[in-house]
Curated annotation (Swiss-Prot):
Gene: aat
Signal peptide region: none
Keyword Lipid biosynthesis listed: no
Listed PANTHER family: LEUCYL/PHENYLALANYL-TRNA--PROTEIN TRANSFERASE, LEUCYL_PHENYLALANYL-TRNA--PROTEIN TRANSFERASE
Organism the protein comes from: Nitrosospira multiformis (strain ATCC 25196 / NCIMB 11849 / C 71)
InterPro entries membership: Acyl_CoA_acyltransferase, Leu/Phe-tRNA_Trfase, Leu/Phe-tRNA_Trfase_C, Leu/Phe-tRNA_Trfase_N
Main location group: cytoplasm
GO molecular function: leucyl-tRNA--protein transferase activity
Protein name (record): Leucyl/phenylalanyl-tRNA--protein transferase
Compartments reported by the entry: Cytoplasm
Purpose of the protein: Functions in the N-end rule pathway of protein degradation where it conjugates Leu, Phe and, less efficiently, Met from aminoacyl-tRNAs to the N-termini of proteins containing an N-terminal arginine or lysine.
Any one GO biological process: protein catabolic process
Keyword Cytoplasm listed: yes
Length: 232
């Protein structure tokens, strides 16, 4: 039976998560910064539709990318070499989330609701949630956002308005994280898109153990600035 969380409840052990649907661990609780940091540090993330209660997940296996295993296709390399774009970080976090929330061709809705945008924007103000943005001709054309704790980046969502724009942001993110000493990027669930970039599945138990070694709780994060950016 899936437990319902109150505002002060602890998450149940990961091994109690359901097999089907894969990884459903708990229901309820809140999206406060404290709760979200507690969740991510244990390998748990919220994912639910508008009108539903908050659902908390820890799937097995877990899709991850180790920065050294990044794969860049020839077509993506060509897009990167063009250099007709600018990468910015943490400049437009909430607009990136709203762009990720926009309906896609293959769906009419999104799980990124206003309450999620509000919650992650609060994490962003604390320096734990970050956006990586691809700009062309002064317009935001792609990007991604996620949560950084210790030496792990937890990817949440991506969007593209022009071909390869989100992948360009992702490649720059991975290369910068490797320079900063990050060792793992959480991609949550398997997709062909992520697999093409080098992500692979590992057992939840291994993922959990790696988190214990790599995630360090900090009272406050910091705004990101990639090596090529000018500090303002």
């Amino acid at each position: 039976m899936i437990p319902w969380l109150s505002s002060d409840s602890l998450f149940p052990p990961l091994h109690t998560a359901l097999i089907q649907p894969n990884g459903l661990l708990a229901v309820g609780g809140d999206l406060s910064p404290r709760r979200l940091i507690e969740a991510y540090s244990q390998g748990i993330f919220p994912w639910f539709n508008d009108g539903d209660p908050i659902l908390w997940w820890s799937p097995d296996p877990r899709m991850v990318l180790f920065p050294r295993e990044l794969k860049v296709s020839r077509s993506l390399q060509k897009s990167l070499r063009k250099g007709n774009y600018e990468i910015r970080t943490d400049r437009n976090f909430t607009p990136v989330m709203r762009a990720c929330a926009a309906p896609r061709r293959d769906s009419c809705g999104t799980w990124i609701q206003n309450k999620m945008i509000f919650a992650y924007s609060a994490l962003h103000e604390m320096g734990f949630a970050h956006s990586v943005e691809t700009w062309m001709d002064g317009e935001l054309v792609g990007g991604l956002y996620g949560v950084a704790l210790g030496r792990v980046f937890f990817g949440e969502s991506m969007f593209s308005r022009v071909s390869n724009a989100s992948k360009i942001a992702f490649v720059h993110l991975v290369r910068q994280l490797e320079r900063w000493g990050f060792e793992m990027i959480d991609c949550q669930m398997k997709t062909a898109h992520l697999a093409s970039l080098g992500a692979r599945e590992i057992p939840r138990e291994e993922f959990s153990q790696r988190l214990k070694e790599l995630v360090n709780y900090m009272e406050r994060g910091e705004k990101w600035c990639f090596d090529h950016e000018q500090v303002e």
